[in-house]
Amino acid sequence: MTAIEKYVEAMENKDYAGLANLFSPDGIINDYCTSSAAQNEYHIYGREAINMFFRNKFGFRKYSILDGEVVNSTQAEFIANFGGYNIKAIATVREVTEDGLIKRLTVRPK
């Protein structure tokens, strides 16, 4: 499986630990979709922060994705749900380490 396929699978299953383990220790997620949902953008730095952030979001049902579809080796489209507000989004793996861990991923409105 590619990094983007693993990302979609972890997000759909709300597997915050599995999601965090896809990232390098200094991995980064930049999520720009939230501005469309009248929330602050997410800029999450580091595997541990990614784990804690999504544990909170999934646990309190403040974030989920629906209808994930991998469109190529680095991108996937899905519906991002921010506490009941849905946005069509596209995630892009921008950079990976030599051992295949995600170093930088962005999520933008589609």
Language-model features, listed with the residues they occupy:
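Alpha-helix boundary recognition
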Residues: 12, 20, 55-58
